[in-house]
């Protein structure tokens, strides 16, 4: 909900140089936030990529009422009804943009602001182009609140729908091409961290799955 940080700049510039798709989730909309147009402009100027808002916030902070899904043309309403275990409980309900139920959710000002901003986005904003997304030239942008888990599920669903399938990997030792669709589990170990707890001789391997399915509790053999 603030401006782009230096760590994000470095990471995303590497993604841009390597043409890796970049998906953006603008968090903490249930707190006071900057203007969403300003946030997208900030991303475009600093990271050098275009943006396409997949949904659009309705208000922010105490006035945050939800998001408008530009694909389904529906409003996903945000309503907090207290806390459970320190985390806000949130009810999510869908409503059409012209649904009379929105009159109960939105003030006349917020309703008109939403209509005006959606018209502006539909008429003047960048068009969605999946090829540009896959080349790392266009970033789909989502708004929500991770703490309350609001807007996270649509983000993940679109991420799975839009991102490409895993690429085949060539084994550096054998030269074998590992098909990501084969059933046998295999993974590339890119980092081993040791002695994180001085009371134990621990070693944790960080890996990228190349084929098969990882299941919690399974045993895997490290070839090295």
Enumerate the language-model features and the residues they cover.
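Single conserved hydrophobic/aromatic residue that forms the stacking wall/gate
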Residues: 1-5, 10
